[in-house]
Amino acid sequence: MTGHIVPGGEGRLLVRLVREQVLGLPLLRGEVPGSGFTARRVRRTARALRRHGVTRVLAPEDFPFWGEAAAQGLRPVETGELCRALAAPIALAALEADGVPPRLAAVALRGDRVTRSLREAALELCPVVRQLLVEVPAGGEALRQTLRREFGLPAVEGGPGRPAHLTLCFSPPGGMERGRIADLSGDWPALPEYRFGLAEGALPEDAAALPLLSALWQAGRLTAESIAVTAHFRT
């Protein structure tokens, strides 16, 4: 069961639990006493949600009390699997933000092995970028051969001597990445320079966008193709 922690409003003294649906996703909404978050109020709300079977929760953007929620047995909704499924849109958003046309771009894919998400990213990117650098020790050569047969020359073995505009990391970075780095590894990738939303329509504002999209995607309520990605770099 997934929960949703939100402020409850002025004058409320008790935790209030309400079943709700957000874009077809059933949630147990935990309304924190009062109009704002405090550590004590969040602990009370998290404890109540956990007693009702909740193990992971959504919360507003920049929610400051994950430690208090974790102490009661709650964790954020995992976003890593969705981020890896969105690797190609993330790459194209990064190139667009940097003003680099995909047909002129070299993009590196790095990982310990060829996973389904890495393979799908390669198949999506290879036809549209100038060069795709596949830097994967386990299964990388077989993937490069598949891409060469289907698309021709763009897929090659990467390495320190080959420049890249962007490196997509499907496993933790090892210090050999070039250009911009999008670390998609782990359960909760940190992608503060990217924005995620619906290609059509709007998300509710009382839950952080990426975890909500991930919960919807995991539940089969939307597809990766219905998610829009943009990038906003400071430098």
Q: Which residues fall in each region the model found?
A:
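Short hydrophobic beta-strand segments
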Residues: 1-8, 55-59, 104-113, 132-136, ...
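Adenosine-phosphate binding glycine-rich loop
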Residues: 10-12, 17-23, 31, 179-235
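Rossmann-like adenosine-cofactor binding region
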Residues: 151-201
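Glycine-rich phosphate/diphosphate-binding loop of Rossmann-like nucleotide-binding domains
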Residues: 97-162
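Structural alpha-beta junctions
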Residues: 20-25, 48-56, 68-78, 124-136, ...
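Metallocofactor- and cofactor-centric catalytic cores in central/energy metabolism, strongly enriched
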Residues: 5-66
